[in-house]
Amino acid sequence: MTIDNYDNSKQDSSKYEVSGTGDGRNGDGGLPLVQCVARARIPTTQGPDIFLHLYSNNRDNKEHLAIVFGEDIRSRSLFRRRQCETQQDRMIRGAYIGKLYPGRTVADEDDRLGLALEFDDSTGELLASKATTWDAHNDTLVRIHSECYTGENAWSARCDCGEQFDRAGRLIACDHEPTSNIKGGNGHGVIVYLRQEGRGIGLGEKLKAYNLQDLGADTVQANLMLKHPVDARDFSLGKAILLDLGIGNVRLLTNNPEKIKQVDHAPYLKCVERVPMVPIHWTNSSEGIDSKEIEGYLRTKIERMGHLLTEPLKLHTNPQPTETSEAQNQNRMNSALSSTSTLAI
């Protein structure tokens, strides 16, 4: 079949329905059900191509995303075979192996690579072969990132969200970051992009919180003054997406102990390492974000939300004496992992 005679009436409407894996990985134990609706290759400025996955779910009406580095990291819900679909249908929604090229007619085989996907004949489920699919036991660099319009699109110096997003991409793409001595993902990893603006309160309420901050409140106080939780995000969506992608061992890019706790879903998913996200300006004063607003933001994260950072404390925010130390960070980490004995730091 060619693009010219493709008949979109043959598309199976069930592709928009949300479904789980049926084996306890997704949709059980309080996890939301997620369904990858579409996947497409995106050439990037980071070096390797990424595959952008769009997800629906039964928890909210938002379209969450997974930015996947590595063609062989495959969504189980996307690649599952569906009744009455054609190979062209599968290619158009992104359920193909290798790369698309003009004239290609088969999604499940790539003649140029000499590889073919395998499926369970009775269920249509993708069978994970090491020759074609990323092994769940591989340690995979992961960032669970929440949407931040101001930090990612409006050059905001109130937060480091945009900086963390960009750095996560660079770390996943590289094999090693010399300045931090962090082992990169070598082209394999995932940024789960959750549409949870303003720690879950939405952009409008976040802008109101900014005004309260200019009036003297910190980020925690501002949320509470607006009758919102300190953090209203739901990281279980990220967990469900990672399970759908067949990820088992996570090297988590975070300073947030709550994310470390929430990523665990025994026996299928565990955090094997926390990779710290130290603000760039703290290690190189000529780079990164330098403002009194971001210093107050980071101080509140550390002192009021328990984030795993040690301040350099040459801040504009009239710092008071602090006992924050590596020992305190270790205590916070131990607390975060009290219910997760499998984590290796």
UniProtKB/Swiss-Prot annotation:
Cellular-component GO terms for this entry: cytoplasm; nucleus
UniProt-listed CDD domains: GTP_cyclohydro2
Domain of life, per lineage: Eukaryota
Keywords for the protein's UniProt record, in alphabetical order: GTP-binding, Hydrolase, Metal-binding, Nucleotide-binding, Riboflavin biosynthesis, Zinc
Function description: Catalyzes the conversion of GTP to 2,5-diamino-6-ribosylamino-4(3H)-pyrimidinone 5'-phosphate (DARP), formate and pyrophosphate.
Further remark: Present with 9520 molecules/cell in log phase SD medium.
The name this protein goes by in its record: GTP cyclohydrolase-2
UniProt gene name: RIB1
